């Protein structure tokens, strides 16, 4: 790999993780950058996951240290997201993931419309714990979005953040807890892609190191600027995701 390609991957890895560390959607930047290297598409996905898990760990640690992650809840949901993602990666080898694209577009539009119309939603933290019924539902949601992230992926960050908003977290708290579950699904996917020989570490390592820096800066920015920063970024990235999925749907 020449110095120009290295600089290219480092720059876009940093930018992808900076955004992904708060609201997700970093794959919109990192995957096209990796495709530019000429790697096969399936290896691009594996290499991206291997790099992204480094950034995901970094933002997870930053949010945990800030006290924004509800460890009682995450300890129960983390293993389910990990397990779901593993099943998702296995399923993608048997079923074409594009069958989900129309449903994903509809769901992302619903998330966007609701978030835009509810202007005061997520400004303050109203989370006061979960009933047994809501905890069971949260476990199911965690497994399902873990599976989705391993199987298809686009919009996982938006869906997870939205789910935490629904149970009462503010935007910053929702982003922090969503990052925790996204880290879990990234671990499982990265391990399995590596096992199947679908990771090119000559690209994954430099991009991953850049993602560590980007994720740390992104998480610190979110923590310092708060909910007023996270909400518009969430709306922007969800809008971009919808546009990207519509382009792919009608391509």
Residue ranges and their predicted role:
Residues 22, 65, 94-95, 117-118, ...:
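Helix-loop junctions at the membrane-solvent interface of multi-pass transporters
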């Amino acid at each position: 790999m020449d110095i120009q390609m290295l600089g290219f991957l480092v720059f876009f890895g940093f930018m992808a993780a900076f955004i992904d560390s708060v609201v997700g959607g970093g794959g919109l930047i990192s995957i096209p950058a990796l495709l530019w290297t000429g790697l096969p598409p399936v290896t691009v996905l594996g290499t991206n996951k291997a790099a992204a898990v480094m950034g995901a760990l970094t933002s997870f640690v930053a949010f945990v240290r800030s006290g924004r992650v509800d460890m009682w809840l995450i300890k129960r949901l983390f293993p389910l997201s990990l397990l779901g993602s593993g099943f998702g990666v296995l399923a993608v080898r048997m079923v074409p993931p594009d069958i989900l694209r129309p449903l994903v577009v509809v769901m992302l539009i619903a998330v966007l419309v609701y978030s835009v119309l509810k202007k005061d939603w997520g400004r303050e933290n109203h989370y006061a714990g979960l009933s047994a019924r809501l905890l069971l539902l949260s476990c199911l949601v965690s497994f399902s979005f873990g599976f989705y992230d391993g199987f298809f992926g686009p919009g996982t960050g938006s869906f997870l953040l939205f789910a935490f908003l629904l149970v009462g977290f503010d935007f910053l708290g929702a982003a922090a807890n969503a990052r925790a579950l996204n880290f879990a699904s990234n671990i499982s996917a990265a391990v399995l892609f590596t096992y199947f020989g679908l990771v090119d570490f000559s690209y994954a390592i430099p991009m991953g190191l850049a993602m560590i820096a980007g994720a740390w800066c992104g998480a610190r920015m979110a923590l310092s600027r708060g909910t007023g920063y996270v909400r518009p970024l969430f709306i922007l990235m969800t809008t971009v995701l919808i546009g990207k999925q519509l382009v792919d749907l009608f391509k």
